[in-house]
């Protein structure tokens, strides 16, 4: 075991008396504090300096910045590897490279666990796995949200472990049964704040929200030296697992510029969720008028169906001001978010027309993640629908879009939480049909800009009437006639006459209607408190 540069100086006189003397247990109490102080020194001044030179906070600084002041109560503060002289006195202490304890984040109790990279890079030869196991099990038993701050191997194996043991071993992922169970029990958030590899990488993605501090954190199954030996690729940590690699692949939900911003994302995310599945989401006192009617919504969607519009102002106009929390950044045109309606947390599905309106494989993954999150923690789902169906083309087929899309639709149909829909524009095909479960009595409103069908009417005329157009004396004139005829029947008023949509509304009424709906939705949520009908998967 490497000797840390915070080696303990032997105390004057006996380290601890054999039993209680005239002074009581004062010597032992002093020894407890001395060992705690050695643990707080982490890997020692040299290793701490290198951590800071790399632009990363230390494990203690991270805990101090994330947790409410004075709220962190460490568990296993004396855990580590002690060296003793012949008289049984402690001469040095290498603290375990995982710091854990209960804390409060914005007043809420959590289980907070953080890797200490200054002690052997977080590798298993400086880990005491029982501490990590206890933290996950305790969180589940006490129904505490789990927050993991990851930096290094998170207790994963190393060559030095095998050398020290004198034999190899069949690997076991520490506390993995509890890690999996907690996903269906309590909110789990993980932050990538350094080179997160192996077991650490797996612990990152076993969460409801994974955050990466770009330029500070990297994520990979194996680091550059192992990759170089295994595949011949000579890559830096950033090239192998930096933000540019993971921004679109569905591994990490949110990216931040700094560690401090990552902590802000964690605080915000937890504020929408209950402490466990046995509670309801926290409802805040209304800071925004539920009857607010925004004039901008009347002109939000252009009359020209080919002209895109900005979805962010629409979200801000409908949901409580400042409450929209972007969820998965990798969804492409699929917008996933958490927000509040009259103080009530909800999940939000929408589309960014500037990035397209069809459901890609990545968008379907983002949708599945959000819907499963809402089902697990009892958040009603609101869809602002402008869905042009599944993405088409060779690239879409190569990526298995229909498989991911069907999985997303299955998540919607399996979700028991109340669902509501505002149809802003398009509802086409399988993708549009599955954005909400229309087999349920889900409340739905449509704006006058609504346009729906099995496929876009504008592009389907040529295919449906190809023979007639080929035989026409003037194909262009015949095409225009067909467009006028079909244009009349695509009016949303025709659909409303047949109750094909429940109601056409003034877009300015969207927020008042949804705020009234969400109060009804929260009345039925107590019936769903408890574990979800199916286990949550990462």
Enumerate the language-model features and the residues they cover:
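Ligand-binding clefts of soluble mixed alpha/beta catalytic domains
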Residues: 2-538
């Amino acid at each position: 075991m490497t000797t840390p540069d915070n080696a303990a100086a032997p105390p004057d006189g006996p380290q601890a008396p054999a039993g209680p003397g005239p002074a009581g247990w004062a010597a032992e109490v002093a020894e407890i504090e001395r060992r705690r102080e050695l643990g707080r020194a982490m890997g020692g001044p040299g290793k701490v300096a290198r951590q800071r030179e790399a632009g990363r906070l230390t494990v203690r600084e991270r805990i101090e910045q994330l947790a409410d002041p004075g709220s962190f109560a460490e568990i296993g503060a004396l855990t580590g590897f002690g060296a003793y002289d012949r008289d049984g006195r402690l001469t040095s202490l290498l603290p375990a490279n995982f710091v854990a304890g209960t804390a409060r984040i914005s007043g809420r109790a959590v289980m907070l666990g953080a890797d200490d990279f200054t002690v052997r890079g977080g590798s298993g030869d400086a880990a005491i796995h029982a501490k990590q196991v206890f933290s996950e099990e305790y969180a589940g038993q006490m129904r505490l949200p789990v927050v993991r701050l990851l930096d290094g191997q998170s207790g994963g194996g190393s060559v030095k472990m095998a050398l020290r043991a004198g034999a190899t071993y069949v690997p076991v992922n520490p506390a993995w049964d509890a890690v999996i169970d907690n996903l269906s029990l309590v909110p789990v958030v993980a932050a990538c704040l350094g080179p997160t590899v192996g077991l650490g990488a797996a612990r990152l993605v076993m969460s409801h929200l994974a955050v990466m501090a770009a330029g500070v954190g990297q994520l990979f199954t194996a680091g550059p030296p192992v990759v170089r030996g295994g595949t011949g690729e000579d890559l830096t940590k950033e090239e192998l697992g930096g933000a540019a690699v993971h921004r679109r692949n569905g591994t990490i939900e949110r990216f931040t510029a700094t560690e401090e911003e990552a902590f802000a994302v964690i605080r915000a995310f937890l504020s929408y969720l209950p402490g466990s599945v046995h509670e309801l989401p926290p409802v805040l006192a209304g800071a925004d008028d539920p009857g607010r009617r925004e004039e901008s919504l009347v002109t939000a969607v252009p009359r020209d169906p080919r002209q895109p519009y900005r979805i962010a102002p629409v979200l801000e106009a409908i949901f409580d001001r400042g409450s929209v929390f972007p969820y998965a950044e990798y969804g492409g045109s699929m917008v996933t978010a958490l927000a509040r309606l009259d103080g009530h947390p909800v999940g939000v599905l929408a589309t960014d027309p500037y990035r397209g309106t069809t459901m890609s494989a990545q968008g379907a993954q983002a949708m599945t993640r959000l819907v499963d999150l809402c089902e697990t923690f009892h958040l009603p789902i609101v869809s602002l629908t402008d869905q042009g169906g599944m993405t088409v083309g060779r690239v879409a087929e190569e990526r298995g879009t229909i498989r991911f899309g069907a999985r997303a639709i299955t998540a919607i149909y399996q979700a028991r939480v109340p669902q509501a829909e505002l149809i802003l524009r398009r509802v086409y095909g399988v993708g549009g049909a599955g954005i909400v479960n229309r087999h349920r009595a889900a409340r739905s409103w449509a704006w006058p800009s609504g346009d729906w069908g099995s496929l876009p009417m504008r592009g389907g005329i040529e295919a449906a009437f190809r023979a007639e157009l080929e035989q026409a004396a003037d194909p262009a004139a015949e095409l225009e006639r067909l467009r006028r005829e079909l244009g009349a029947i695509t009016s949303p008023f025709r659909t409303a006459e047949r109750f094909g949509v429940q109601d056409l509304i003034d877009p300015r009424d969207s927020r008042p209607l949804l705020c009234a709906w969400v109060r009804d939705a929260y009345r039925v949520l107590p019936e769903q408190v408890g574990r979800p009908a199916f286990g949550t998967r990462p």
